[in-house]
C-alpha cells in the first residue's frame, strides 16, 4: 500500500499545491475495475484538466480538478452507466499524506464489502 500512496502523492503533487494555494476544490477517485473499457469511458468523460493514472492492474487514480465532492459523485455515477467498478471518492481539504492514506484505507474497506 505504501508504494501506491507515494505514487499518488507524486502524480498529484501539483494539483494538491494548487488546491491548497488557491482554495479550489480537488476531488480524488480511487477506482477498482477489471473492465477493459474503463479507460475508454474515463477518457470520454474526463476534461483536459483532469488527471488519470493507473496505479496497479486494477487500481486507477483520477484527480478531478475544480470539482467538489458532490460533482465527483455525479461523475462516478456517470461512469457506472458504462462499466462495472467500485470507487472511493473524497475531496482534498489540506493534508495530502493523511488524505491519501485515508482514501486508500476507505478503498480497502470498500473492496472487502464488495
Spans of model-derived segments:
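Regulatory and interdomain segments flanking nucleotide-handling catalytic cores
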Residues: 1-114
